[in-house]
Amino acid sequence: MVKNHNPKNEMQDMLTPLDAEEAAKTKLRLDMREIPKSSIKPEHFHLMYLLEQHSPYFIDAELTELRDSFQIHYDINDNHTPFDNIKSFTKNEKLRYLLNIKNLEEVNRTRYTFVLAPDELFFTRDGLPIAKTRGLQNVVDPLPVSEAEFLTRYKALVICAFNEKQSFDALVEGNLELHKGTPFETKVIEAATLDLLTAFLDEQYQKQEQDYSQNYAYVRKVGHTVFKWVAIGMTTLSVLLIAFLAFLYFSVMKHNERIEKGYQAFVKDDYTQVLNTYDDLDGKKLDKEALYIYAKSYIQTNKQGLEKDKKENLLNNVTPNSNKDYLLYWMELGQGHLDEAINIATYLDDNDITKLALINKLNEIKNNGDLSNDKRSEETKKYNDKLQDILDKEKQVKDEKAKSEEEKAKAKDEKLKQQEENEKKQKEQAQKDKEKRQEAERKK
């Protein structure tokens, strides 16, 4: 049997795999960002790994260094709700999600930068906002967001969540002040500050919550059997909840007792006991005071074998008012969490503590019997290069300073020499003038 030739069907067959391929490419672009190395200064390459560090404000990511670029792969999964999805939520839920966007303003107080836009914004299952693309100030885009720009974009997001006909880009680019919408949208636009905007959203959210609680109820017609099993289930759940709360209570008590025990040892200058007491505590969950106690105790015990002057200098830097990340660094270092210590030191841009953490990491690699020779060589080279990079930069700064001082001294010597020559010429000229006057007197 001979089949009829149908060009339309053949065209559809050809387009189908192309469409699937294009969809795959689109997903790849959403899940991946590529940054050319040519757009980054070589001395900033080591900072790029900050883009894969876990942060409550960003989607988890993995950084891969290629020959000519850095690739960032984002872990976007079913636990992440895109901004566009909240448009279908109930009004009270929508307001709750929108109200939480204010948390992203905290990013402006860190080294990170981000983009506040619908296609860049996701939410966790708890409704907390997380951004996709992140940058580093003065290192890699995006540029920092000013307070005014953050407020403008925040307003545009709120309006777009309730009015799907509006374009976010158009609102941000100048149409926000000209927008004529509902009284709710007008109030959003009129908010002059972030606090006023969030206060208004919170007010609307509370009204919606009250309305739902007063006017809505869910009633089901069920039989006695269902009620019986519900009662049994609730009783079981209550017992489990009480057991969990009891466990949590005693865990917290035990944790607090250890903190207090460490403090008492610190007051007695028993620094070794402080380290032993805090040995397996999670530094990220400790307050600043506890971190200070550990940091000072660690330096006092001189586990690193530091010279006296170096030790005293570090002790002067460790105070109750020190940066919390700086104090956390010493706990991570003391507990052997060297990768975390290196990340913190790099983030703080402190060469002294970065070198100390790198030296400890190299010793750890050297003494790790589980590593193969190839892996040990690879790891050693990786961290040696980072250490040498810091040493080279410090030497360059030192050489430039010495050269500058030498040039200043040379210029000073030349100035003194010129002054001496001028004084000598003045004296010679004065002597000649004197001799001329004497000669003139004799001729009279």
Curated annotation (Swiss-Prot):
UniProt-annotated stretches for the region Disordered: 366-444
Keywords assigned: Cell membrane, Coiled coil, Membrane, Transmembrane, Transmembrane helix
Gene3D superfamilies (UniProt xref): Transferase(Phosphotransferase) domain 1, Type VII secretion system EssB, C-terminal-like domain
Transmembrane region(s): 230-250
Coiled coil: 387-443
Membrane topology: Single-pass membrane protein
Cytoplasmic topological segments: 1-229
Extracellular compartment residues: 251-444
One protein family per Pfam: YukC
Protein localization: Cell membrane
Keyword Coiled coil: yes
Biased composition range(s): Basic and acidic residues: 372-444
Primary location recorded for the protein, binned into one broad class: membrane
Gene Ontology CC, one term: plasma membrane
Role: Component of the type VII secretion system (Ess). Required for the secretion of EsxA and EsxB.
Similarity section: Belongs to the EssB family.
Binding partners and assembly: Homodimer.
Name of this protein: Type VII secretion system protein EssB
Organism: Staphylococcus aureus (strain NCTC 8325 / PS 47)
Species lineage: Bacteria, Bacillati, Bacillota, Bacilli, Bacillales
Gene field: essB
